[in-house]
Amino acid sequence: MRPNNRDTILRAAEKLILQHGVGALTLEDVASAAHMSKGGVFYHFKTKDELVHQLLVFAFANFEASVDSMAQDDTEPGGWLRAYVRATFDISAITETESLASAALIAAYFGKDSAVQKVYENAHGRWSQRARNDGITPATADVIRMATDGLWLAEALGASRFSRDRKREFVAQLLELSRHESA
């Protein structure tokens, strides 16, 4: 299926954020990167803040769809949480571009834009609730989810010192922990 104009604009904005950072993002540059007129971009997004807000909504919706898809095959206690861990670190589930763009947006706008902060808080509230109701102890669910989020953010911000092998071990340990802590 061919992406619609709105999705094309959002993908173009993701790429620009990766290339130049959030601070350099302009609607004019997004229009150029999306191969459409400025008016076409303004039809969907009146301001840069609105674009950023919708980009986070878009990224989180794609991520949640990946988690839900992966969780369908794992009906044991902790299955949704294992899907969350896998989707966070599986390049086929969420692209590195989406992951890095989301982190950049969160870092740049968190605390500055209450609408963006609300999107982030709502998503994390949903994920926390699902993790805590996934059939393993709530404390273990919190540890796994927060460790997953912490490594994702460290990687997205370039602060992770894990080798590829160490990352695999870390993820395997989180997955294993989710299998032995039934509520």
Can you describe what each PLM-predicted range is?
Residues 3-4, 46, 50, 54, ...:
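Residues at secondary-structure transition points
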Residues 8, 16-50, 54:
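Helix-turn-helix
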Residues 84-88, 102-107, 144-151:
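Short alpha-helical scaffolding segments that buttress acidic/His motifs in well-ordered protein cores
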